[in-house]
């Protein structure tokens, strides 16, 4: 794995944690966080995940098809094997943490933010069916974070089917078509476009094919700059990506497209291997690697970790503050480590 890809994964999950941070930050910090989020709103960290997902989707799919062809395996069997492999990668974490949230919600006796048992059951079922993005619009709940995993699997299935049976050219043309279309029109309506922003994944596909015509050494040479400029460029891109949704808030279709473009530039710079998004210093690099390698487990478990801390504090009538914030981070780290070691790779 390219070190800088790990760096991008770490940046992406930190951006997601920041946007959800109001759940766990001490009450006396919340006004400052709200003011900060009026300009810097970081759900766009998901765009980095999506662009990377698209890039590695087509990378792994082409390699998988080539290996299967050499073994004389048919298209349908190859497709099924590929999709099952992807499902095994995503499912264990989703099923485990969604089940924990479901049980916890039922035991909470319908106290906010938990919904009544019927709604909770609907949310749980849509989550384990990987259709969460189609139900978030009806009732908000703590299953909401799974919309992105659902969308990713949906796109993987559809894109893989199109690629296997209609070929590379059709897949590229359709990718470019939807990238263009979704600059002006998106599914889900004005309030829920974020639930169907699959064009970010398609940007990753296009990057893969563009780089087929450029050698790694040439790519590195093109983007080679001094440490000073690497620092300026990388920080600027993170800041711009964090501010796009607010700056272009009146254009809910365009702002997501701009976010995807910026995330694509970041992925391109990372693939060049010039050190834009990775600090290779002792302890810092280990921290980056830990966060990146566990980013999926962190994504699936962080909300439950934080709500568990809040429920415990509420039950014992403790006052939330710096202590609850630190405890929330520690519990999240512990749950993420357990999830990474014993759940995420369970079916591999």
List PLM regions with ranges.
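Interfacial loop-to-helix transition and helix-capping segments at the boundaries
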Residues: 2-3, 34-46, 139-151, 186-203, ...
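Structural signal for the C-terminal ends of transmembrane alpha-helices
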Residues: 57-66, 104-108, 162-168, 206-216, ...
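Alpha-helical transmembrane segments of multi-pass integral membrane proteins
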Residues: 16, 201, 206, 229-345
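Transmembrane alpha-helical segments and their boundary/interface "anchor" motifs
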Residues: 43-46, 62-108, 117-126, 154-156, ...
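Solvent-exposed interhelical
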Residues: 153-180, 209-230
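Functionally critical transmembrane alpha-helices in membrane proteins and complexes, commonly lining
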Residues: 3-66, 91-94, 131, 200-201, ...
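Aromatic-anchored segments of alpha-helical transmembrane domains
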Residues: 14-22, 103, 177-187, 235-246, ...
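Membrane-interface helix-loop-helix regions
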Residues: 75-77, 90-151, 184-185, 259-272
């Amino acid at each position: 794995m390219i070190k800088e890809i790990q760096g991008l994964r770490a940046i992406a999950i930190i951006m997601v944690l920041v946007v959800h941070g109001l759940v766990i930050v001490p009450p006396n910090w919340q006004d400052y966080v709200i003011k900060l989020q009026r300009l810097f709103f970081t759900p766009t960290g998901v765009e980095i995940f999506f662009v990377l997902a698209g890039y590695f989707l087509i990378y792994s799919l082409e390699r998988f098809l080539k290996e299967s062809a050499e073994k004389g395996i048919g298209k349908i069997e190859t497709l099924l094997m590929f999709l099952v492999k992807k499902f095994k990668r995503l499912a264990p974490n989703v099923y485990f943490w969604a089940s924990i949230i479901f049980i916890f919600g039922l035991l909470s006796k319908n106290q906010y933010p938990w919904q009544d048992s019927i709604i909770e059951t609907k949310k749980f079922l849509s989550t384990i069916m990987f259709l969460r993005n189609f139900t978030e619009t009806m009732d908000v709940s703590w299953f909401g974070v799974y919309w992105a995993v659902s969308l990713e699997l949906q796109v993987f299935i559809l894109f893989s089917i199109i690629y296997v049976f209609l070929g590379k050219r059709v897949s590229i043309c359709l990718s470019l078509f939807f990238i263009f279309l979704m600059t002006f029109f998106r599914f889900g309506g004005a309030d829920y476009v974020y639930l169907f922003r699959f064009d970010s994944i398609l940007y990753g596909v296009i990057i893969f094919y563009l780089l087929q015509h450029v050698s790694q050494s040439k790519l590195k040479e093109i983007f080679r700059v001094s440490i000073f400029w690497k620092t300026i460029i990388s920080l600027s891109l993170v800041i711009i990506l964090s501010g796009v949704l607010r700056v272009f808030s009146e254009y809910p279709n365009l702002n997501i497209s701009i976010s995807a473009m910026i995330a694509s530039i970041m992925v391109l710079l990372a693939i060049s291997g010039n050190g834009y998004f990775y600090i290779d210093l002792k302890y810092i690099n280990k921290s980056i690697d830990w966060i990146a390698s566990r980013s999926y487990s962190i994504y699936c478990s962080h909300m439950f970790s934080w709500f568990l801390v809040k429920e415990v504090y509420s039950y014992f009538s403790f006052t939330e503050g710096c202590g609850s914030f630190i405890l929330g981070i520690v519990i999240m780290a512990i749950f993420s480590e357990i999830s990474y070691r014993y759940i995420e790779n369970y079916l591999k």
